[in-house]
Amino acid sequence: MEKGPVSQFITHHYRHFNAAALIDAAKGYEAHIDAGGKMMITLGGAMSTAELGISLAEMIRRDKVQIITCTGANLEEDIMNLVAHSHYKRVPHYRDLTPQDEWNLLENHMNRVTDTCIPEEEAFRRLQGHIFKIWKDADDKGERYLPYEFMYKLLRSGELEQYYEIDPKNSWMLAACEKNIPIIVPGWEDSTMGNIFTSYVIKGELKASTVKGGIETMIFLTEWYRANSGGKGVGFFQIAGGISGDFPICVVPMMYQDLEWEDTPCWAYFCQISDSTTSYGSYSGAVPNEKITWGKLPPDTPKFIVESDATIVAPLIFAYVLGW
């Protein structure tokens, strides 16, 4: 495949240091997929609010990723951007805000993520009304699902289409739903929808067990990895740090150490994009080789780390893999 202008630009200019690491990681990703391998992408930080979906959705459609792990915030915020985009407010001078300015944003029901404010009413509450019906229907029937399965039900219901404010092709959740790829969401409770669900449980309107939790999520991931790690194996492309990376990478040592499935393949490719620097006790900032000692990566797995802003780096790597 002949590369497009973005790929040609970074290949020509990104020759050394962190820039070269970006190219190496992109070429490694492409080689793994071209050889028949599969890829997990993990999303930490505020990648959905950063509108990574513009490139990630195409990665999903083009079969460059087979499974995603993300925080509960990233699961919901892509859909929030889909239905409330025009109500978001950008605050480019956010560093100059006083505590009173921040309070005024709250009073206006705007929740800030760096330079972007998410509108409570149009984003959170708009989803709440529709997702509650889906939770309640499952609860009444005694059915139980993982967090992403409920979100897929919401998207497939068509209830949100009346609110769409961006081109649907730029929503990675819609692309994932159309492909029906699994999404691992560890710690879903730490999200707006997780908090809202909890409030209904406290009020006695829903049962906590209706949404499957962390142990069942790990079991689901174990079954998926067992079924998909043959051949060229599964790669691990980690965007930012935190639980979205920490949780899924542990499935490998759990399978061969705790389950004693000694034929379990290790991750076949590893890349992390993070601005968390190496420091004493920092897991997110640890170099990939540290993971060898935990049985997550073998010595011969291609390993890359790009220490930079993921909102800049990830779209460039995706562009290279897509041939843009």
Describe the role of every protein-language-model region.
Residues 57-127:
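A generic, well-ordered mixed alpha/beta core segment in the N-terminal half of proteins
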Residues 51-54, 79-85, 195-199, 248-252, ...:
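Short acidic, glycine/serine/threonine-rich loops at helix termini
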Residues 39-48, 68, 184-188, 208-283:
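Glycine-rich anion-binding loop/nest that anchors nucleotide
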Residues 74-78, 191-192, 277-280:
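Short gly/pro/ser/thr-enriched loop/turn and capping motifs at secondary-structure boundaries
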Residues 6, 17-20, 233, 243, ...:
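C-terminal functional extensions of proteins
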Residues 1-26, 30-33:
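N-terminal glycine-rich anion-binding loop in soluble enzyme alpha/beta folds
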Residues 25-39, 175-179, 223-233:
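Glycine-rich phosphate/diphosphate-binding loops that line cofactor/substrate pockets in enzymes
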Residues 101-192:
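Ligand-binding beta-strand-loop-alpha-helix segment within the catalytic cores
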